[in-house]
Amino acid sequence: MTADTPTTADIDLIQRILPHRYPFLLVDRVRDIEPFKSAVGLKNVTVNEPHFQGHFPGVPIMPGVTIVEAMAQTAAVMVGVSADLADKNFLVYFMGIDSCKFRRKVGPGDVLELHVTATRGKPGAKVWKFDGRAEVDGELACECSFTAMMDLPTSPPGEAG
């Protein structure tokens, strides 16, 4: 983290930090990054997302687990930006999800605001814990706590290290 640490991440920077790609890249922008502390992700929900074909035909509802994954991706971007991990083959693994509650349906046309706050973890730590909440137009859609392991491989994925 330096004085030049960005407070926002556009899709280009997000893709330089996260290994996720379509159809599993679930955050479009991250703003209000407070290094190693918190951030707000944005996810524009569109009818073109593949899960809407079967969840549910005629009544498209974003699966709750994808909302939680979007919060986790937001948290990973916050840590990745804070630690200057763009282009460094940064990986994050879910370790646990606690106290998850879904409060409203999310569907095409909604913009998810993904608020994440680190409750455990510090620069260089492998295990982090976060509180997250997802909102649509200021209305709570989901809230949970989750734990993740941050991993910085010594070689690109798929290559021997």
Curated annotation (Swiss-Prot):
MF terms (GO), sorted A to Z: (3R)-hydroxyacyl-[acyl-carrier-protein] dehydratase activity
UniProt xrefs under SUPFAM superfamilies: Thioesterase/thiol ester dehydrase-isomerase
Catalytic residues as annotated in Swiss-Prot or TrEMBL: H55
Enzyme Commission number(s) from the entry: 4.2.1.59
One Pfam family cited in the UniProt record for this chain: FabA
InterPro entries, A to Z: FabA_FabZ (IPR013114), FabZ (IPR010084), HotDog_dom_sf (IPR029069)
Family annotation (CDD domains): FabZ
GO biological process, one term: lipid A biosynthetic process
GO annotation, cellular component aspect: cytoplasm; membrane
Keywords: Cytoplasm, Lipid A biosynthesis, Lipid biosynthesis, Lipid metabolism, Lyase
Described purpose of this protein according to its UniProt entry: Involved in unsaturated fatty acids biosynthesis. Catalyzes the dehydration of short chain beta-hydroxyacyl-ACPs and long chain saturated and unsaturated beta-hydroxyacyl-ACPs.
HAMAP family: FabZ
Family indicated by similarity: Belongs to the thioester dehydratase family. FabZ subfamily.
NCBIfam families according to UniProt: fabZ, PRK00006.1
Protein name: 3-hydroxyacyl-[acyl-carrier-protein] dehydratase FabZ
Organism: Jannaschia sp. (strain CCS1)
